[in-house]
């Protein structure tokens, strides 16, 4: 009886050790984390956004940059600058601003419609966030954008979406001339 109990305890210990090792590998390896989040929560890309009909959730894990009147169903966190460049130039600059973040991948782009979509991951846990951008004409050789960054996982993002949006906007204002009114 004691030998059977010892075998059971030893087997349980080995199983718990294997589970702990697997958990460590899954949480410490970036590729494994991405796989784990996809397995638990589905594909990381949350899909396209129509800024004209956008309604934000009640959770604090989104950030919206939108010109006045373009997002009538949502309150923006910030207004974007108007750039003294044509929309295709701003479109290319948005791509470059996003690519400067090492954990960001472009998942969709339509130059004719002026839309881009990215999956950006947080540095430590690699939580996926979807960033949708629409580049808008704002007059002759002038353009602006709408940007919506939202988390797939969790209720709070500890400000990650807002920091990302501000970082991208800072890159754009450094790279492009801002229009004077």
Give, region by region, the residue ranges found by the protein language model:
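Ser/Thr-rich, low-complexity intrinsically disordered terminal regions
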Residues: 2-12, 22-181
